[in-house]
Amino acid sequence: VLREDFLLTGTKESCGEGECGACTVLVDGHPMNSCLVLVAELDGKHVLTVEGLARDGRLHPLQEAFLEVGAVQCGYCTPGMLLSGIALLNLYPHPTREQIRKEMEGNICRCTGYARIADAIQLAAERINGKD
């Protein structure tokens, strides 16, 4: 529905089984694999896709950090990584590497860019919440 009816193509379609995280969206602030959610289950809920991250033409600080540290390789996993990363930052304002690893384990990067993704999350945390 997101891609075909609303033309929100940032949410990627990949495994269709909730295994890869490429289709991650935030539902009421919580990451969910959109491939596993029925539209009827979302009635009255706030759904955020990667298209909704930028505000007034400015990228979200996590998007900026991804670009700055080179956390984007092929880019296919990036929308899901960003949304899961934002949920993580809402949960842990100053996440440790272990917290990042645990919270991001539902998102797969086939290019193995995990270290830079974690770097970007920690950089964004510093910019959003100040240094710990």
PLM regions with names:
Residues 1-132:
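Signature of N-terminal electron-transfer/Fe-S-associated modules in redox systems
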